[in-house]
Structures are given as structure tokens and as C-alpha cells.
């Protein structure tokens, strides 16, 4: 079952509701059925997502972009945010929560100079790369659905637009905390931390301790990177907007 994302309850300092602008002539090419069952989605849920993306029928979903900041290549950038993707909801399985994220669904308030599109070859790379990492038992986001389109977009050359539905335990990045910390907005920083405690059963053992939460995030991130090194994997863009709070390999490009 897909539920409205609880992150929306935090308010407009955290999120911006956005109507997706889907690429032209979207065609569903692939459903990761094993992943769907693991995160608590049935055939009706998958049909609802497909109808939403291809026919824009499902009005129950409330897509939104998240605000965050980040250090990029050593320099702090005070506002980044979801520039070409939207969170559309959450699913639940075995007391765990999973995010559902559209990648390549058009311009958002955080797009800056981008066109909000993902391209076919990078979307294929993300799908295959994430499944390979999962098969090697390295924590990672994964792709639930893969869509092709007929739309052409300008990069170094013209490319074909595509879209994926990405899943992960959370899309809360290090940069979400930085966004409020560097604004000296302690009230909303605390709201974000409380949201983590209230939403994720993985943090129950922290007993509301921010120090324990921080240590758990550090440990899971260090374990992930050690797994990368053991494999010989290089992420290539290790900015703080590309790390989430569960130490999952994230944002393949």
C-alpha cells in the first residue's frame, strides 16, 4: 500500500508540492517485481503508479520536492533540493518504511538551470548498478520501475529522456540537516531530527539521543564505504547531498 509521505507534515520549509511534468510518450519498460514484494507493494499499487505516470490518473498521490543544501566538492551550497525528482509516497513492510521517488519528472522550484530530466543511458546505468550492488549485499537505493520516452533533451548531444521510480529507506540526506544548521534554524533542525526518531524503527535504540543518532549514521556510512573499497567501487560524486541517513549507496548519476 502506498501512503502519503509523512515528510509533508513538516511543512513548506521542508517541501514544495509540485505537479510532475512527465516526459513525452512515457512507456513502462520494466517492473522490479522482487523489489515490489519486498517493500510491501502489490499489483494494484504498481498499476496505480503506472497510471499516475503514464495517464496522470491517480490524484491521491501528492508529489513534492524536498529542500536541502550540501557541500559539493568542498564548497558549501546553501540551497540545492530535488531538482529533477519528486517523492510520491511511502510503503511499509515488516515495520520498515520505504520511499518512492520519481526521477526525471520535470522542473521543480529547486531545478536552478536544469531541465528536470533524466536521460536514458544514465537511468539504465542506475538501474543495473543498483541491482548489482544489491546482489553483492552492499546497501543501496534501487529502481522499482523504468520508463522510456520519445522526448529528446539537450546535453553534450541530444539524448532521450527517461524516468525511474527509485526506492530507498529514506531520502533524508546529510544536506537536509545542513540546510537548517547553516541557517541557524534550530527549531526546524529539531523538527527534522524528531521526524527521524518518530518515523524510522531503526533509530528506536537511540532512545531519543541525538549523539546516538549521529553515531549510528556515521557507523552505517563508514560500513558502506568500507564495502565500496572492498569491491573497488568508486562513487565519483561524494557530496553531502548524495549521502542518506541509512548508509545506502545513493544517486548513481
Describe the residue ranges of each PLM region.
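Membrane-interfacial amphipathic/re-entrant helices at transmembrane-helix boundaries
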Residues: 205-215
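Short, flexible segments with low predicted structural confidence
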Residues: 6-9, 104-105, 215
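Catalytic activation segment of kinase domains across protein kinase-like and atypical kinase folds
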Residues: 158, 230-235, 239-253
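Short, contiguous strand/loop micro-motifs
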Residues: 19-21, 115-117, 211-212
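N-terminal accessory/targeting segments that precede structured cores
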Residues: 1-32, 41-44, 52
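Short aromatic-glycine motifs in intrinsically disordered, low-complexity regions
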Residues: 25-26, 228-232
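Phosphate/ATP-binding catalytic cores across multiple sugar-kinase/actin-like superfamilies
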Residues: 217-228
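Conserved ATP-binding subdomain of kinase catalytic cores across diverse folds
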Residues: 25-28, 34-49, 54-206, 223-224, ...
Amino acid at each position: 500500500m502506498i501512503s502519503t509521505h509523512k515528510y509533508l507534515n513538516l511543512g513548506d520549509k521542508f517541501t514544495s508540492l509540485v505537479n510532475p511534468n512527465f516526459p513525452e510518450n512515457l512507456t513502462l519498460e520494466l517492473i522490479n517485481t522482487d523489489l515490489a514484494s519486498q517493500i510491501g507493494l502489490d499489483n494494484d499499487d504498481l498499476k496505480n503508479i503506472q497510471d499516475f505516470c503514464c495517464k496522470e490518473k491517480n490524484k491521491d498521490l501528492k508529489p513534492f520536492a524536498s529542500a536541502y543544501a550540501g557541500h559539493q566538492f568542498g564548497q558549501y551550497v546553501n540551497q540545492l533540493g530535488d531538482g529533477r525528482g519528486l517523492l510520491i509516497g511511502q510503503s511499509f513492510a515488516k515495520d520498515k518504511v520505504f520511499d518512492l521517488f520519481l526521477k526525471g519528472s520535470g522542473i521543480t522550484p529547486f531545478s536552478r538551470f536544469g531541465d528536470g530530466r533524466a536521460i536514458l543511458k544514465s537511468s539504465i546505468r542506475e538501474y543495473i548498478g543498483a541491482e548489482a550492488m544489491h546482489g553483492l549485499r552492499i546497501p543501496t537505493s534501487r529502481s522499482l520501475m523504468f520508463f522510456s520516452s520519445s522526448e529528446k533533451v539537450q546535453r553534450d548531444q541530444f539524448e532521450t529522456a527517461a524516468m525511474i521510480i527509485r526506492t530507498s529507506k529514506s531520502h533524508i540526506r546529510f544536506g537536509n540537516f545542513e540546510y537548517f544548521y547553516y541557517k541557524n534554524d534550530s527549531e526546524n533542525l529539531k523538527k527534522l531530527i524528531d521526524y527521524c526518531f518518530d518515523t524510522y524503527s531503526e533509530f528506536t535504540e537511540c532512545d531519543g539521543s541525538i549523539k546516538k543518532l549521529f553515531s549510528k549514521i556515521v557507523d552505517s556510512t563508514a560500513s558502506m564505504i568500507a564495502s565500496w573499497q572492498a569491491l573497488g567501487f568508486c562513487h565519483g560524486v561524494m557530496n553531502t547531498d548524495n549521502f542518506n541517513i541509512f548508509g545506502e549507496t545513493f544517486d548513481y548519476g
